[in-house]
Amino acid sequence: MASEATYDWDICDDVVVPNRGLADREGTARGEEVDILAGATVPVGLGAELFFVVTHAAGEATAAEARGADIPHGQRGPRTFTIERALIPNLMEATEVSDDPSLPDPHVQRLGAIDIDDSSHPVENLVTPSVIRHEDPAHPDEGWLMIALSLINDVDAQIVVLRSSDRQHWRVLGPLELPAEAALRPDRPFAPRIVSMVDADSSARRDVLFVTFPGGAGESDEVAGYVVGNLSGSAFKVTTPFTVIDFGHDFTRPRVIDYHTPVMFGLVGAHPSLDGQWANCLSAPRYLSLVGGELYQDVVGAPTAVRTFSDYAFIWSAQLDAQQGSVDVDVTDDSGQVIATISYTNDAVSVTRLGVDTRTAPLKDADSDTLTVFLDGPVCEVFADGGAVTLTSAIPAHSQISDIDVRATGGAKIISSMQTAGRHLMRMQAGLTSPEDQEAYMAEALIADRDVAAGIFDED
């Protein structure tokens, strides 16, 4: 659970887990649940209501055959999918950790499957529900909006729109209708999400639709983007066509917390494999702003979080003058190897892994040239020109990030810069990596404090 402190998390018991074929607390048998898949959360008083997807084995398939980890990426497999709800009446009561790690949180009340009226457009196997409160003059009595994927067959899917007055009974309006100017990719969509935001330029309220598609040649495995406009019924009127939201190697399937200022985080890596060293990493949470129909992403509070909670995270931020030349940032590990290079020029920013694998994002004219490089564990996140452009990449390294080397060449200048390091990195830079060195340093500090108090030395 997200803490009140920026980028901090409270450890909690699992909220919802598969039932392993056991009856629920009321003694009702539901059949063996194979997986629980994420969906959406909406605030309810002091608590929250959860929308999630339960999978069961289809037909004669066994639970083992229907587990998501054993099914090729992007395929339905021998599974059925059902959207259910759960309620956490009071979030603060759910922060206690029980002694038995195998049990779900007893404060969570599973409410069962939602009811779906699909008489106007039949659907089945709905997944990835995104639920928000959304006013639509065409449906004044149904103030809740859901968009979800309807799995058509083993590999195809369609985004559909549903409305509800009470979050339990839902009516399918039909498939999401987007005009040609939306410029969506023709491939199968993944993980649609929607939020409503106010554009800072026009003060107009806009709906922002996030969709992920398979990547093409020279792109990452999956490419996430957004479309801006207004949704009424199932028709989406577009004001900003599909725009890639992150140009790095590995950002995909973003989740968005619908709030006054929406917060987004994404998966780092399309699908875990044995070739990778990390799995199921998340990007840093990003505060979203809509300005002139374009999204800006900001890691507010990240320097404080790095100093307070992290051992190996590192942030470097700078204001640049790159009308000519380039600014290059080499990321080195503790063996001195350059494991990533970030390059910033007047019209592009790029990330290169191990000197050979590059992703590049175009830059528009901006009021100022700024660059932020955020490193934590295996993840490198780059924010350019105030968050107008981002690149997120996993860095394949067998050792920890140690330092950065910054160069301005060809007439480029670094006007100002700031860096923040995690606790272990600061100890490394101070030569205090061993317990003996740390004890000696603390002893010297105590002696110095005593001498100052005794008047032997002046504090200045």
Please state what every model-predicted region is.
Residues 1-460:
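Carbohydrate-active catalytic/glycan-binding domains of CAZyme proteins
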